[in-house]
């Protein structure tokens, strides 16, 4: 059965990616602003991906209780820098690279160190003001020495999944989706729903 999920985020790029992933799995998704005016989400915690995802999903579920609300939280973990980034990835990188090139920054950050990375995503599904399922996904791999590929943007141009030689941006869409941390979290969630 095709589900219609409402995506609880302001991030247009994240909405587009989740819509594409849901469509790939024969589901439907749309940003919450197609149903509500823009909302001021509560500040994210620094506790866990799961807590942040739950809070965002519940916040929109309170206003759209009959809808299937999904929200995620993701982060980058670098074995070369234990304790850095993680749940606070977006905030920390925004401070370190206010208007710069994040890919170039990460490429040089790991020079002479382990180039390994782990991207983690937790996605929460809320219905009727209750979190009913939590999906988890992660991608492990290495950071390339330079951007490669045109099939995607952002970190996909520097992330090489473990066991592969291509960056995510060099892969065709079905292959790339199979590796994406967010897609793996969505798939984990859909599997729990029996979809």
Curated annotation (Swiss-Prot):
<comment type="similarity">
    <text>Belongs to the HAM1 NTPase family.</text>
</comment>
<protein>
    <recommendedName>
        <fullName>Dihydroneopterin triphosphate diphosphatase</fullName>
        <ecNumber>3.6.1.67</ecNumber>
    </recommendedName>
</protein>
<keyword id="KW-0378">Hydrolase</keyword>
<dbReference type="Pfam" id="PF01725">
    <property type="entry name" value="Ham1p_like"/>
</dbReference>
<dbReference type="InterPro" id="IPR029001">
    <property type="entry name" value="ITPase-like_fam"/>
</dbReference>
<dbReference type="GO" id="GO:0047429">
    <property type="term" value="F:nucleoside triphosphate diphosphatase activity"/>
</dbReference>
<dbReference type="GO" id="GO:0009143">
    <property type="term" value="P:nucleoside triphosphate catabolic process"/>
</dbReference>
<dbReference type="InterPro" id="IPR002637">
    <property type="entry name" value="RdgB/HAM1"/>
</dbReference>
<dbReference type="GO" id="GO:0005829">
    <property type="term" value="C:cytosol"/>
</dbReference>
<keyword id="KW-0464">Manganese</keyword>
<comment type="function">
    <text>Pyrophosphatase involved in the biosynthesis of tetrahydrofolate. Catalyzes the hydrolysis of dihydroneopterin triphosphate (DHNTP) to dihydroneopterin monophosphate (DHNMP) and pyrophosphate. Shows a strict substrate specificity. Has only weak activity with GTP, ITP, XTP and dTTP, and cannot use ATP, UTP, CTP, NAD(+), NADH, diadenosine triphosphate, diadenosine tetraphosphate, ADP-ribose and UDP-glucose.</text>
</comment>
<comment type="pathway">
    <text>Cofactor biosynthesis; tetrahydrofolate biosynthesis.</text>
</comment>
<feature type="active site" description="Proton acceptor">
    <location>
        <position position="73"/>
    </location>
</feature>
């Amino acid at each position: 059965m095709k589900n219609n999920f409402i995506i609880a985020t302001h991030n247009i790029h994240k909405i587009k990616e989740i819509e594409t992933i849901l469509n790939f799995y024969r589901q439907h998704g749309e940003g919450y602003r197609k149903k509500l005016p823009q909302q001021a989400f509560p500040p994210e915690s620094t506790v866990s991906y799961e807590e942040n995802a739950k809070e965002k999903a519940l916040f929109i579920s309170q206003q759209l209780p009959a809808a299937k609300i999904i929200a995620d939280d993701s982060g980058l973990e670098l074995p070369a820098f234990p304790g850095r980034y993680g749940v606070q990835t977006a905030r920390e990188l925004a401070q370190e690279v206010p208007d710069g090139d994040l890919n170039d920054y990460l490429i040089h950050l790991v020079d002479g160190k382990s180039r390994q990375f782990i991207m983690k995503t937790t996605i929460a599904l809320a219905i009727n003001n209750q979190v009913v399922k939590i999906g988890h996904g992660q991608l492990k791999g290495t950071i390339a020495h330079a951007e490669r590929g045109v099939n995607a943007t952002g970190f996909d141009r520097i992330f090489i999944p473990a066991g592969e030689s291509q960056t995510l941006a060099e892969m065709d869409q079905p292959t790339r989706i199979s590796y994406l941390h967010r897609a793996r979290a969505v798939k984990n969630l859909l599997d729990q729903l029996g979809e």
